[in-house]
């Protein structure tokens, strides 16, 4: 059986996604961190950003925008706990602009602005 990392992204009271992947890139507060097989155990504080799931050829296969949180990395698993998560495929500049404008809290506005900035910079060609 081929080795991989079991990753789980969860929000409060709900598991959003569980799967296996060769590599995962998480947005740490001190910079992006690539989680590899047999990596030393660590706990990483996450910033608002993009979680990327990579295949063996380092091609991005899945993307998720998260709103902060922590990543618990140990024994070939990466458990990401976050307040909000949105799959990249489910993003849209117009809809996320409306969500940003309707947001009450500044941190929610900043989260949606981060998504909008990413989409306007890189476009939808990556979907």
Predicted regions and their residues:
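Acidic/glycine-rich phosphate/pyrophosphate-binding loops and surrounding catalytic core
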Residues: 85-127
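N-terminal export/targeting signal detector
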Residues: 1-6, 105
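Compact, glycine-rich, soluble single-domain proteins
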Residues: 6-99
């Amino acid at each position: 059986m081929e080795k991989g990392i079991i990753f789980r992204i969860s929000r409060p009271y709900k598991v959003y996604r569980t799967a296996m992947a060769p590599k995962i890139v998480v947005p740490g507060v001190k910079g992006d961190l690539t989680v590899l097989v047999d990596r030393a155990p660590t706990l990483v504080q996450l910033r608002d950003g993009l979680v990327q799931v990579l295949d063996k050829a380092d091609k991005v296969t899945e993307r998720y925008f998260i709103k902060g949180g922590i990543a618990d990395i140990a024994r070939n698993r990466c458990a990401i706990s976050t307040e909000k998560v949105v799959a990249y495929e489910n993003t849209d500049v117009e809809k996320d602009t409306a969500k940003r404008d309707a947001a009450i809290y500044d941190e929610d506005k900043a989260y949606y602005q981060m998504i909008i900035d990413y989409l306007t910079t890189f476009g939808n060609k990556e979907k």
